[in-house]
């Protein structure tokens, strides 16, 4: 018997704001427990929420980038439940009138394009964090309470784990390049819940849904869905039935584990939030935000390949993060050759970042200085070997490349009036190499170049030396 899967995803993005959604408390990842809270976050009597309007702006950016319909009027609702990390005993979210509906993302899987619908996206506040100690006590940290979230709910349009993976990859890149979120799963600024059901092929009625929450990597999403497909198939083939339930993914075993069985849909007794008035989102404001929307990663890819002539692989490496793409764009705008800039970004810069476990914002290299260094290579002022020393200094201290080269006597020797006598002497002193060259041994010229480089302590222009050596050897 063949089965068909139906998969839906709910993705929470932490919006990149300086303060929380309903209070002026700052938002800083990794801050000491309960140091970024105030009376609103603690739900003290008499306190009222104040909406951070920047949350709407960031949400609208994502809505525009995913072809979603932005509702002209939106308001907040209360989702009622009790938990220690939720001091109000309700969460402020959007249930009846979300920010946007009816969007889509196009993905390509196994060479075929498919449109995945977005049911809705809504804004809500995050809850605090519970920590259970080994001493029998539990601790509550409310730094995260009130951090703004954008939840993007897909339609159940995905039919296998690979489609879900492709959807997540594309959604993550779209959100990242709008600047609405930094989408760092390791810091919790992107979290994924999945639901999956299977049914016999040809059956129209959907099967019973199983949820998996807070999956912390794309790989876990793919592996958990693949396992759950097989598990549900085995249950049905054995004559059993699927329970409406929530399961978690066990990374060590690669299996999903039952957490709780549901008897029906949860009743959170949603009702409109009485302390926040409905908000009207004007078309004028939407149009203004659309003008501010950064260029999408897909448009950038077209520019990199078709305008700058980069290889698709190099373009994709640059587009792994918005920071990398922005840095490259700024370097090219400052006059860097696009191909050389991409090569330096994808090798030396990324290598340094990976080796030192830092990001572009942590180092002192600027796009302008990278462009200056590339120009020094292009005009023959320094060799690629010297450039690596210049790069190390510029990354560490932000030193101007041109000044550093001049102050340290690193200017490449390209003067033919100086190099020609050296070339003639090296050729005269190495008759065996001349004979080897005439016999077609390419290594001979490499040896001679090495002798020149040794005499000049690496300052001779290798291209110029090669050219002069070839001319001299051909004349013998």
Curated annotation (Swiss-Prot):
Q: Which GO terms describe its molecular function?
A: asparaginyl-tRNA synthase (glutamine-hydrolyzing) activity; ATP binding; glutaminyl-tRNA synthase (glutamine-hydrolyzing) activity
Per the UniProt record, which EC number(s) apply here?
6.3.5.-
Any single biological process term in GO: translation
Q: Which InterPro entries match?
A: Asn/Gln-tRNA_amidoTrfase_suB/E, Asn/Gln-tRNA_Trfase_suB/E_cat, Asn/Gln_amidotransferase, Asn/Gln_tRNA_amidoTrase-B-like, GatB, GatB_C_1, GatB_Yqey_C_2, Gln-tRNA_amidoTrfase_suB_CS
Name of one Pfam family that matches: GatB_Yqey
Catalytic reaction list = L-glutamyl-tRNA(Gln) + L-glutamine + ATP + H2O = L-glutaminyl-tRNA(Gln) + L-glutamate + ADP + phosphate + H(+); L-aspartyl-tRNA(Asn) + L-glutamine + ATP + H2O = L-asparaginyl-tRNA(Asn) + L-glutamate + ADP + phosphate + 2 H(+)
Q: Which UniProt keywords apply?
A: ATP-binding, Ligase, Nucleotide-binding, Protein biosynthesis
EC main class here is ligase
The keyword ATP-binding appears for this protein: yes
Under the subunit heading, UniProt states: Heterotrimer of A, B and C subunits.
Q: What does this protein do?
A: Allows the formation of correctly charged Asn-tRNA(Asn) or Gln-tRNA(Gln) through the transamidation of misacylated Asp-tRNA(Asn) or Glu-tRNA(Gln) in organisms which lack either or both of asparaginyl-tRNA or glutaminyl-tRNA synthetases. The reaction takes place in the presence of glutamine and ATP through an activated phospho-Asp-tRNA(Asn) or phospho-Glu-tRNA(Gln).
Please give the family membership noted in the entry: Belongs to the GatB/GatE family. GatB subfamily.
Q: What is this protein called?
A: Aspartyl/glutamyl-tRNA(Asn/Gln) amidotransferase subunit B
């Amino acid at each position: 018997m063949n089965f068909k899967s139906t998969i839906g995803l709910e993705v929470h993005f932490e919006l990149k704001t300086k303060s929380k959604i309903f209070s002026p408390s700052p938002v800083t990842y990794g801050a000491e427990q309960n140091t970024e809270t105030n009376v609103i976050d603690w739900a003290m009597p008499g306190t009222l929420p104040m909406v951070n309007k920047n949350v709407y702006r960031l949400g609208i950016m994502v809505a525009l980038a995913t072809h979603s319909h932005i509702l002209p009027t939106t308001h907040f609702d209360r989702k009622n439940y009790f938990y220690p990390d939720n001091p109000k005993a309700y969460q402020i979210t959007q249930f009846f009138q979300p920010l946007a509906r009816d969007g889509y993302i196009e993905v390509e899987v196994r060479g075929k394009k498919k449109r995945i619908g977005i049911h809705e996206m809504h804004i809500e506040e995050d809850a605090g964090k519970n920590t259970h100690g080994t001493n029998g006590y539990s601790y509550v940290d409310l730094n995260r309470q009130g951090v703004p979230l954008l939840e993007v709910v897909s339609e159940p349009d995905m039919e296998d784990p690979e489609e879900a993976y492709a959807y997540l990859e594309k959604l993550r890149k779209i959100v990242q390049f709008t600047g609405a979120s930094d989408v760092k799963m390791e810091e919790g600024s992107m979290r994924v819940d999945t639901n999956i059901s299977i049914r016999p092929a040809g059956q129209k009625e959907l099967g019973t849904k199983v949820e998996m929450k807070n999956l912390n990597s794309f790989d876990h999403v793919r592996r958990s869905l693949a396992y759950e497909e097989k598990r549900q198939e085995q249950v049905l083939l054995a004559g059993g039935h699927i329970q409406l339930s929530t399961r978690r993914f066990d990374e060590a075993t690669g299996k999903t584990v039952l957490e709780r069985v549901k008897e029906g849909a949860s009743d959170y007794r949603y009702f409109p939030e009485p302390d926040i008035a409905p908000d009207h989102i004007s078309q004028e404001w939407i149009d203004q935000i659309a003008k501010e929307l950064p260029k999408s990663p897909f448009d950038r890819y077209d520019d990199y390949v078709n305008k700058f002539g980069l290889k698709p692989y190099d373009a994709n490496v640059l587009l792994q993060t918005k920071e990398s793409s922005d840095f490259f764009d700024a370097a090219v705008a400052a006059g860097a050759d696009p191909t050389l800039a991409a090569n330096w970004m994808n090798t030396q810069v990324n290598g340094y970042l990976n080796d030192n476990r830092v990001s572009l914002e942590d180092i002192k290299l600027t796009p302008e200085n990278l462009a200056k260094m590339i120009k020094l290579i292009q005009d023959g002022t320094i060799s690629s070997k010297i450039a690596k020393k210049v790069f190390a200094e510029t990354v560490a201290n932000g030193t101007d490349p041109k000044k550093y080269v001049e102050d340290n006597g690193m200017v490449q020797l390209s003067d033919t009036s100086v190099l020609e006598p050296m070339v003639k002497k090296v050729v005269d002193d190495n008759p065996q190499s001349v004979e080897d060259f005439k016999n077609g041994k390419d290594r001979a010229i490499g040896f001679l170049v090495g002798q020149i480089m040794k005499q000049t302590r690496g300052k001779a222009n290798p291209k110029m030396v090669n050219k002069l050596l070839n001319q001299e050897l051909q004349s013998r």
